[in-house]
Amino acid sequence: MLQPKRRKYRKEQKGRNTGVATRGNAVSFGEYGLKAIGRGRLTARQIEAARRAMTRHIKRGGRIWIRIFPDKPISQKPAEVRMGNGKGNPEYYVAEIQPGKMLYEMDGVSEELAREAFRLAAAKLPLKTTFMVRQLGA
C-alpha cells in the first residue's frame, strides 16, 4: 500500500478540504482517465483496491497511472480509552480529493475496456467519478 517513506512530523491537524483541483485535473499520461466529481478522502486501501480491480479487468494489456498519493496521516485513539492524554497514533494515510482531480489514467486499451475497468474501480471508491478521454493538444 502507498504511504510516505518519511515525514517531517508524524501527526497532522485535521484541516478542511475546500476548493476545486486546479492542478492534476487533466488527462496527462494516458489516453483515458477517471476524474473525481465529488470531494472527500481516499485511504491507501481504497486506492489499492481500485487499482487491483482495474488491473484484473485489463489483464496484461495497457498501462495504469495512479495520479494521487495518500500523504496525510489520520490518527486514532484505541478503543475504550478515556479522553485526554494527547493525540492518538497515526493509523492510516489518506489522499484529500477535491472535485476535478484526476485519480487514475490508462493507456494501451480500447475505450470500452477502459470504461468498464474504471466502472469497476469507481465501485470501490467513496466518491462520484466520471470517465475522461484525452483532449487534442492537452
From Swiss-Prot:
The keyword Transport does not apply. GO terms for biological process: translation. Residues 1-22 are annotated as: Disordered. GO terms for molecular function: rRNA binding; structural constituent of ribosome; tRNA binding. Residues 1-13 have a biased composition (Basic residues). GO terms for cellular component: cytosolic large ribosomal subunit. Keywords: Ribonucleoprotein, Ribosomal protein, RNA-binding, rRNA-binding, tRNA-binding. It holds the Pfam family Ribosomal_L16. Gene3D superfamilies: Ribosomal protein L10e/L16 (3.90.1170.10). PANTHER family: 50S/60S RIBOSOMAL PROTEIN L16, LARGE RIBOSOMAL SUBUNIT PROTEIN UL16M. Belongs to the universal ribosomal protein uL16 family. Binds 23S rRNA and is also seen to make contacts with the A and possibly P site tRNAs. This is Large ribosomal subunit protein uL16. It comes from Paraburkholderia phymatum (strain DSM 17167 / CIP 108236 / LMG 21445 / STM815).
